[in-house]
Amino acid sequence: MLKELGAIPTRGRIVVDRNRITGGGVTAGIDFGLKLVALLKSRVYAEAVQLYLEYDPQPPFNAGSPEKAQPLARQFLKDMFAGMRANALATAKRAMQRLGA
């Protein structure tokens, strides 16, 4: 949907773009925080925070991105969210029209 709204989608969990930092995915919040600590303090500081949190993710399945998930799982989600995606896209397009974008 990002492409349809004029954005440039990327696969990065954390993306630094000029003065903006964004994170995607449910667990990316911790990754985002650690990256921010590294940028503001240092890598060693961020690693110490990671160690303190004992943040050592080991997901039980290797399906955390479209490239890694099996086709059946991708199609399952696509079908599940088809209506929501259509509504969200229509809402975003109406908002863009109101803003003159």
Q: How would you name each of these model-derived features?
A:
Residues 1-101:
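Active-site-adjacent pocket-lining segments in enzyme domains
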